[in-house]
Amino acid sequence: MRKSGILLHIASLPNKYGIGTMGREAYKFVDWLRSAGQSLWQILPLSQTSFGDSPYQSFSIYAGNPYFISLETLEEEGLLKHKEYADINWCKDPRYIDYATMYENFYKVMRLAFGRFSKGRNGNVSEEYKAFVAENPWLENYTLFMALKDAHGGKSWCEWETPLRLRDVTAVYSAKKKYAKDMEFYAFLQFEFFRQWYKLKKYANDNGIQIIGDIPIYCALDSADVWCESQLFQLDRDRVPTVVAGFPPDAFSEDGQLWGNPIYDWDRMKQENYRWWVGRMSFAKKLYDIVRIDHFIGFNSYYAIPFGNKTAHGGEWHDGPKYDLFNVIKRETGKGGIIAEDLGIITPSVRKLLKQAAYPGMKVLQFAFDPTGKSEYLPQNYTSQNCVVYTSTHDSDTALGWFNNLDRKTKQFVKEYLGVRHAAELPEAFIDIAWKSTADMAMTTMQELCGFGTEARINVPSTIGNNWRWRTLESDFTAQSAAYLDRLTEISNRKPPVKKSRKKR
């Protein structure tokens, strides 16, 4: 069945309190998607972000981002008083997230909520909390990790004293006793996060909207996952990485890309029948309806850079687990529900892996406009319907911003191909050809639908300091844009069957 939808991260939803949350505005967005005839809502990883604010660098592959907890919902639950959070000036400009202000204020407010939760926990909530802790075995290691980070002033676990860094049994046991209350605080945050998330997901599903989630291929070095299961990564006896992930120098980057993530010990993972990945994918498939796996080509082969290098020079290519991993994942978690982010160098070996896995790959229209007209990303050249077409992604500029930075020859080709005369017409033309393509799924962004330029870009890869900040305003979600998208979706045969609307939250 042909489908379509919008890519909009939770953080980019509007509200008064600094960052998008799983509160009222998220439910309103589901209602808007329904009115626009859509069936998909794609988000970025829900993971708790670390320094740099990227959802692709997190303290845990399992833990949700506490910033997405709705403070208004906590007030409704009796855990907060309105004044305790409403009087805070969360941001100077509602268009952009101020992460420094969020960090300074959010956890203070949540400590107040936790205090009331601890005192008043009883009955159904108490049983629900106990069940949550019992059903999530990752929680103990994660909460201890966060408590210890606080105790060490936010320092990476790599800088902790040796017994804790190497997870000496006695040291870990003592830390659990010493920081039990802090661990419970972080468990409370996760309890509230997942409580709100699954209610929102159910509301979306009840209204015919599937959630497309996203998981990074690699873990951050400073994460509970690497600290607790160091044997699964290429680290030395002192838990220092021997190699890190990245991408070699090419025509676009003289020094290549140095991502810095530790690389998996795939031989060890295979010996354990990919237990770690099966657990991760099982969790992700519960969290989302469809899972987009970032940097899928890294499972075919990966570029390993010696730890300590300042650039990506000097790295080497190595074979990844290839289909062996996905064969196990399919057997243990089911066949469907995965999108492969297959952007990059597509070798015959990568094509073989994609064919074996049978996951839909991605087609980004901004990559399509080679003036020869032969690009595999142009809709006329798609060889399979088993793909997802995007007008743009979180890592690219908006269509308008992209167009404004093209050379004159390519601009002319784009205009001729799309049949537009002015740059302002481009975003709508992009959406039009994506929706009318043969791809099974078509996705655009709210930035595209609103016709925004580079000012609305989410992320510029390999840069830090000004990414992941852009947000929508309530005024962006117009009845006019919903009606336009609804009609386009209908004539493109992507509109889902009409269902009776479910009650609002």
Where does each model-flagged region fall?
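N-terminal regions that are enriched for targeting/export leaders
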Residues: 1-11, 27
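Alpha-amylase-like alpha-glycosidases and glucanotransferases acting on alpha-linked glucans and related
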Residues: 9, 15, 53-190, 194, ...
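Catalytic domains of carbohydrate-active enzymes, especially glycoside hydrolases
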Residues: 24-49, 287-288, 434-436
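Outer-envelope exported proteins of Gram-negative bacteria
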Residues: 44, 210-212, 216, 290, ...
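C-terminal accessory segments of extracellular proteins
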Residues: 480-495
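Short Lys/Arg-rich cationic patches that frequently serve as NLS/NoLS or arginine-rich RNA/DNA-binding motifs
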Residues: 497-505
